[in-house]
Every structure is written in C-alpha cells, then in structure tokens.
Amino acid sequence: MFKSVLVLLAAAAASSVAIAQTPSTGRWKLEAAPSGCVVHAASPSGTVVSIWGIAGQDSLSFLVQNKAWNSFADGQRYDIHISFDEKKPWPMRAVARRNIDKDGPGLTFAVSPNHAAGGASFIDQFAAAGGMNITRNGQRIETVSLDGTQVALRGLAQCLSQVWAASGSGESEAESGASVAAETI
C-alpha cells in the first residue's frame, strides 16, 4: 500500500525483525521492515488509511489516500479536523501528497501517542471508534470505518516493540538480509 514508506524503512534498517503474531480480522494488514512497521486498510469507497511508526520516534504518522482526491496540491499544508464517532474534532495540520502509489493522492499528519485533550488521547479515541470523520473548512472530506482498529494498533505496537528491541544488534543491512514481511490482522 504505502510502498515508499516500506522502502524507506528497509533502507534505514539495522536488523531484521519477526512480526508479532496477532489475531486476524482480515481488514488491516501489518507490514514490518527492520526499522519500523505499518498497518493499513482499504474502505469500500477506495479510501486507504495507513499508520506507521519507526522505532524510537515519538510519533505515529497517518496517511489517508483516495484516488478521487485530485484537488489537493502536492506539498501544500491543509488544516483539517479529525473526529471519532461524533466526538469533539481534533485539529490537524496535514500535508498533501499526490504521487505516492496506486492508492492515489493523500493527506499525511503525525500524532504523538500521548497527544491528549479532555482526558482521552487521539490514539485511544482512534482505537475505540467505529468511524473517523475528516473535514476541512466544515466540509466532509471522508468518513472511514475503523473496524478492527484495536487489533491493528496492538499489532503495530508489538511490531514496533520487536523492531526497537532488535535495533541494538549492530548488524548491517546486508548481514541481516533486510526484508519486509506482511501479515493480515
């Protein structure tokens, strides 16, 4: 799905990692590279949601893509709002990317797992929600189902934990046979 992220992760690799075994929901796919992990899922409307982390970094990156989103200018920053199950929206500054991959243009933003408002973190709300609404200037851009998100984020956390633990081995990329592994969760 977001192959360029996986290529970046593999290129920055120091060692290989095994994927954590997690129950399958059939909706989210987990991919691991030696320096990070990504989960992604596609909606029936063609929108793809990807979340990735690189071991040791303090935020998770989100990418929401749809082939129909042709009005976004590449590299342009957009103020958007993300809300979950009609809760108070989270303001985000997203950057548009046009030529990413076959899933189309998208908006990307980063969130610290500790980023909280009103007692609940963005990640906690994301994991617990049935849906995510994305708006800009009061207009709906997309609404995405988040079925299976708790399992996907648990798999992402386990994968990042394994990558972080393995990163201290000092092995070179060539020695490790750096590869990308995938699993549907």
Stretches found by the model and what they are:
Residues 15-18:
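N-terminal signal peptide c-region/cleavage motif recognized by signal peptidases
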Residues 20-185:
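A generic "folded-domain core" signal
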Residues 1-7:
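Bacterial N-terminal signal peptides that target proteins for export
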